[in-house]
């Protein structure tokens, strides 16, 4: 099973930078998730081209936490000069405003979209000790243990996609929150959680290494 998350670059509304002078210094790219996450991988690939294309370096600033809200807030409150960008996902760019009663910034007024970078698939992965080979097997196991099936979540995208799947399958899962995908995948391998719906960059190396099972 795969779902997709979209990545895009946003910046605080710029009022100072002009085409004639921009960029005149390094550009900070805030990644609202931990190093090693798919968003981090995409962000680093993107900023690696800054010096070649713009003549200035791009500097990654990882600000994980609160489903991306911490990083998004840092960009919203940065100087609106075009030198601080947000490498966001549908968590930061869309879901947070629906899931939280109040955000520490105005989603519509504090950001300006700059570019769409691409999309990344999420893959349902389980601990190797589980006697399941397919989603059908996993659903049957979860139905036999309602509420006991623990899944990891390190972002809004991961949580929403897993809960949508659970609702469609008619099963009850229990979420275990994590600050980052790398931390969650470590606990999945160790058997602290049973399932993790995570991005390709995090899951596939472990699936190929035989440490977890992709469904």
Language-model features: where?
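Short helix-initiation/N-cap motifs at beta->coil->alpha
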Residues: 63-71, 120, 175-186, 199-202
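A ligand-binding cleft/hinge motif common to bilobed small-molecule-binding domains
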Residues: 92-102, 159, 163-168, 195-215
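Hinge/capping helix and adjacent helix->loop/strand transition within the periplasmic-binding protein
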Residues: 50, 77-82, 98-183
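N-terminal signal peptide c-region/cleavage motif recognized by signal peptidases
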Residues: 14-16
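Hydrophobic residues within well-ordered alpha-helices
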Residues: 36, 75-76, 162, 188-189, ...
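Alpha-to-beta junction loops
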Residues: 56, 78-87, 145-149, 171, ...
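Extracytoplasmic "Venus flytrap"
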Residues: 29-44, 66, 151-156
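Short, well-ordered beta-strand elements
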Residues: 25-34, 58-59, 84-87, 112, ...
């Amino acid at each position: 099973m795969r779902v997709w998350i979209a990545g895009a670059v946003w910046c605080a509304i710029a009022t100072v930078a002009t085409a004639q002078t921009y960029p005149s210094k390094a550009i900070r790219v805030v990644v609202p998730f931990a190093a090693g996450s798919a968003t981090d991988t995409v962000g680093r690939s993107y900023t690696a081209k800054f010096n070649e294309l713009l003549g200035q370096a791009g500097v990654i600033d990882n600000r994980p936490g609160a489903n991306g809200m911490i990083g998004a807030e840092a960009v919203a409150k940065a100087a609106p000069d075009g030198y601080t960008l947000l490498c966001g996902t549908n968590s930061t760019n869309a879901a947070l405003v629906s899931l939280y009663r109040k955000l520490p910034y105005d989603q519509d007024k504090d950001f300006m979209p700059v570019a769409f970078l691409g999309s990344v698939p999420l893959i349902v992965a389980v601990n190797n000790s589980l006697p399941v080979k397919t989603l059908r097997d996993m659903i049957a196991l979860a139905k036999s243990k309602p509420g006991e099936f623990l899944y990891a979540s390190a972002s809004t995208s991961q949580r929403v996609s897993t809960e949508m799947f659970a609702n469609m399958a008619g099963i009850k899962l229990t979420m275990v929150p994590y600050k980052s995908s790398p931390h969650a995948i470590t606990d999945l391998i160790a058997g602290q959680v049973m399932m993790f719906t995570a991005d390709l960059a995090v899951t596939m190396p472990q699936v190929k290494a035989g440490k977890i099972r992709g469904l």
